[in-house]
Regions:
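Active-site-adjacent betaalpha module
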Residues: 1-133
Length: 133
């Protein structure tokens, strides 16, 4: 995100940093999509706090990782109990695209599928070549 301003912060819980929260609020959006390393700390802490404040928070579980499988899974359980939604990257991409007739972002989504979704991305590329689209 080269055009994004870096926010220098000291809080472990990002959502405790007023500068971060103000930047998010300024977007006017009501839904947060969060993923990151150390699911049990860097993801769970802001998710639980933001959900508690009434934000619609979704955690992308397969784009997050904890120090162990157990800590990742326990953090996910905590976030669900706090009111967060969970989904995978592929589910998120599908919900955002919804209809392949919506062509405005198909090229970008196709690149993401090819680069990051292994066999699914290759299958999609192959299908597009067969359909000559």
């Amino acid at each position: 995100f080269p055009d994004q301003e870096v926010i220098d912060r000291t809080w472990v819980n990002t959502w405790q940093d007023e500068n971060v929260v103000n930047v998010v609020k300024a977007t006017g959006r009501k839904q947060l999509i969060i993923a990151g390393l150390w699911t049990e700390v860097c993801v769970a802490m802001p998710v639980i706090q933001a959900a508690g404040e009434g934000w619609d928070v979704t955690v992308i579980t397969d784009a997050s990782g904890g120090i162990s499988k157990e800590s990742h899974e326990v953090a996910i359980q905590r976030m669900i109990a706090a009111g967060a939604n969970v989904m995978t990257v592929m589910a998120l991409a599908g919900e955002w695209q919804r209809d392949w007739a919506r062509t405005e972002h198909v090229e970008e989504l196709t690149e993401i599928l090819i680069q990051h979704f292994g066999g699914s991305g290759i299958a999609y590329l192959w299908e597009q070549q067969l359909l000559n689209t």
